[in-house]
Amino acid sequence: MRLVVCLVFLAPFALVCHGQVYKGGYTRPIPRPPPFVRPLPGGPIGPYNGCPVSCRGISFSQARSCCSRLGRCCHVGKGYSG
């Protein structure tokens, strides 16, 4: 009987305390900023995007990354599209 009385008394208190965590401004850990993007070979960096201005001299993986992230895709003999 005492256990039931204790649980009935403590349950609302626990819910109120648990709710205060969220009302008190608890936030997740702040994510780290992305590492500094170094210039890729083949030309200067385009503004704020991390992809070279020219398709020359970049690896296949770099070209694929620019294409999938930013829609700037290299085409043979044509350079970037998009």
From Swiss-Prot:
Pfam families according to UniProt: Penaeidin
Disulfide bonds, paired cysteine numbers: C51-C66, C55-C73, C67-C74
Serine amide: residues bearing it: S81
Entry keywords, A to Z: Amidation, Antibiotic, Antimicrobial, Chitin-binding, Disulfide bond, Fungicide, Pyrrolidone carboxylic acid, Signal
Localization, UniProt: Cytoplasmic granule
Main location: cytoplasm
Cellular component GO terms held in the UniProt record: cytoplasm
Biological process according to GO: defense response to bacterium; defense response to fungus; killing of cells of another organism
Residues found modified as Pyrrolidone carboxylic acid: Q20
GO molecular function, one term: chitin binding
Signal peptide extent: 1-19
InterPro entries referenced in this protein's UniProt entry, alphabetically: Penaeidin (IPR009226)
Role summary: Antibacterial and antifungal activity. Presents chitin-binding activity.
Family recorded in the similarity comment: Belongs to the penaeidin family.
Name used for this protein in its record: Penaeidin-3e
